[in-house]
A protein has these predicted regions:
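Gly/Pro/Ser/Thr-rich low-complexity, intrinsically disordered segments predominantly at protein N-termini
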Residues: 1-200
Length: 200
């Protein structure tokens, strides 16, 4: 008797990028697997818009580029293509070799947390992001309550490995809390980020 195993198809990065051009939805790519991204709630999208507006206006005239959730990021150590909810790059923007639509040198990354993705954003995705040498600061924005988590890279690694760096963790929960974004020398107020958000 022959048993047929239905193993998931393994895609090359080139196959993924080709499929992504013609896809109606955005997909992540992780080490051969294509992962459809779920649509966001209105609150999720409002928070992405508010955060990126605060970043864009705060950094006008400075040598940074601000990107929203449609900008693809390449993480070579994990063979990972993803679309962060927010991203700041110190100019010049570096593109993946042979691509005009995929960046590789973020300074600050942000994700808006949902019940289905918060563990992934805090753990696996953060671990992948930490392998990028330019990455300095990570923001996790809660969409169910007034709450933001900040991770800031500290000093030089002890062993020379990018994975051996220490990260400073801070939480913000009050409207008047000032979030100091040290990687880009910008301060934003938590209440401004959540100004038009209704949690009901």
């Amino acid at each position: 008797m022959t048993v047929t195993l239905n193993l998931p198809k393994v895609y090359t990065p080139e196959e993924y990028l080709n499929l992504e051009i013609h896809s109606d939805i955005r997909n992540e790519y992780l080490n051969g697997e294509i992962i459809p991204m779920t649509g966001g709630t209105p609150v999720h999208n409002q928070l992405i818009s508010a955060l990126n507006a605060l970043l864009w206006f705060g950094l006008r005239g400075k040598p940074y580029s601000v990107f929203m959730a449609d900008q693809r990021l390449w993480i070579p150590d994990y063979q990972f293509y993803t679309y962060p909810d927010g991203m700041v790059i110190q100019n010049p923007v570096e593109l993946q070799s042979g691509r005009k639509d995929t960046v590789k040198n973020p300074l600050l990354l942000a994700e808006v947390l949902s019940n289905s993705t918060k563990a992934y954003d805090r753990d696996e995705k953060f671990a992948a992001y930490r392998t990028l040498p330019t990455f300095q600061e990570y923001l996790l924005v809660d969409q169910s309550s007034l709450h933001l988590e900040q991770y800031l890279k500290q000093g030089a690694p002890r062993s020379g490995s990018l994975r051996d760096r220490q990260w400073l963790f801070r939480e913000y929960e009050q409207p008047d809390d000032k979030i100091v974004l040290a990687s880009i020398a910008l301060e934003i107020r938590l209440g401004d980020l959540y100004e038009q958000i209704n949690f009901d």
